[in-house]
Amino acid sequence: MIVITDLDGTLAHAAWRANLMHDWDAYHAASIADKPNMPMILAVNALSKYCGVACLTSRPERWRQLTNDWLLKYDVLLHHLIM
């Protein structure tokens, strides 16, 4: 079994940067400051012990390193990050 989750608005609280949507680069760059949605992260981490967990995000590939840094900062246990 594979569980699929989203990132912005699911694992990360992203609503605070909605005012930046007119400038996608600024919007995605600001994502490093997103606060974690800890109940969702804890659920994903628990599931990752029993099945594959993939995060499917619409973030562009060029934001992969920033996204990985954020995921590592909050110890999100994923098997795949699909961008």
Report each predicted region and the residues it spans.
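Alpha-helical substrate-recognition element adjacent to the catalytic core
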Residues: 1-83
